């Protein structure tokens, strides 16, 4: 039964990768074509998160295709070096996504609690520094992963997580659990502040449509992260610390969680952005009338 669970996970990841690639490509195209989005300093962190989701989706494809194509109903016997190299995007994106999410949550906390300080912060520099820190931690995780990896074959192992050493899994579990708790804490303070908002200075600054839009998108992304990243990270971290490996049970489920999170982030952005909704509505309407005209012409010809 375990091998069938792995196969289901592999197929699910392939489907999610297709959806994630399309949705994040659409958002990146919007940022490129609409000057109001690219110049919106409040959305810079959202842009970086979208870029990381897109790159993860594309770079993880060789790994997903390999494990799906070489699935065996009886015994797995994957090449350890290919598994480790092709799975590099997973630990990197998990750390990047967590740090960017923490930065988004911290930024919203500052905006809600200390609006005067928030207005003095250069949002572009804040986002750029966050991106550099996130990439640095991701590189550190990848180096540790290869340092403590076991390059020996692991018959019956259906995930790259089985090839990394116990030291890295222990570190990974603790670090991701800590980051998860930070996200929970910052998110809780945001929700609490929104329910008891009495700051007249913030209400005045909140009249800015760009600020309100960034607020809605950020809160939506935090909820998505809590569901698809933080909760799994905490549970997996506890399991790893206790000596149990979830990788051996359900395969690369972390990749599925990251993809779910990326798709939800894209959906939240589109739902809260008027330009994105107008473009999608326009394309849908145009496609509908185009198909109707083709059908009418076909009926007239017959």
Identify the meaning behind each predicted range:
Residues 1-302:
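Seven-transmembrane-like multi-pass membrane architecture, highlighting hydrophobic TM helices
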């Amino acid at each position: 039964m375990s091998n069938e669970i792995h196969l289901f996970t592999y197929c699910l990841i392939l489907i999610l990768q297709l959806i994630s690639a399309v949705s994040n490509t659409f958002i990146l195209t919007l940022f490129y074509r609409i000057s109001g989005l690219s110049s919106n300093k409040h959305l810079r962190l959202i842009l970086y998160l979208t870029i990381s989701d897109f790159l993860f989706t594309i770079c993880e494809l060789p790994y997903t295709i390999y494990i799906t194509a070489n699935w065996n109903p009886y015994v797995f016997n994957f090449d350890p070096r290919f598994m480790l190299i092709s799975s590099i995007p997973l630990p990197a994106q998990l750390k990047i996504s967590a740090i960017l999410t923490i930065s988004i949550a911290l930024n919203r906390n500052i905006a809600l609690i200390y609006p005067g300080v928030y207005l003095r912060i250069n949002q572009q520099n804040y986002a750029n520094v966050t991106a550099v820190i996130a990439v640095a931690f991701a590189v550190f995780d990848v180096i540790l992963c290869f340092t403590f990896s076991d390059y020996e074959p692991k018959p019956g192992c259906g995930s790259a997580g089985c090839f990394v050493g116990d030291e890295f899994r222990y570190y990974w579990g603790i670090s991701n659990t800590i980051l998860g708790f930070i996200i929970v804490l910052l998110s809780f303070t945001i929700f609490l502040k929104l329910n008891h908002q009495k700051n007249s200075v913030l209400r005045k600054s909140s009249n800015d449509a760009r600020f309100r839009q960034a607020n809605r998108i950020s809160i939506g992304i935090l909820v998505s992260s809590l569901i698809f990243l933080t909760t799994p990270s905490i549970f997996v971290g506890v399991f790893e610390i206790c000596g149990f490996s979830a990788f051996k049970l359900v395969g690369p489920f972390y990749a599925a969680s990251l993809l779910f999170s990326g798709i939800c982030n894209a959906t939240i952005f589109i739902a809260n952005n008027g330009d994105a909704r107008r473009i999608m509505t326009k394309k849908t309407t145009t496609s509908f009338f185009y198909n109707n005209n083709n059908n009418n012409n076909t009926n007239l010809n017959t």
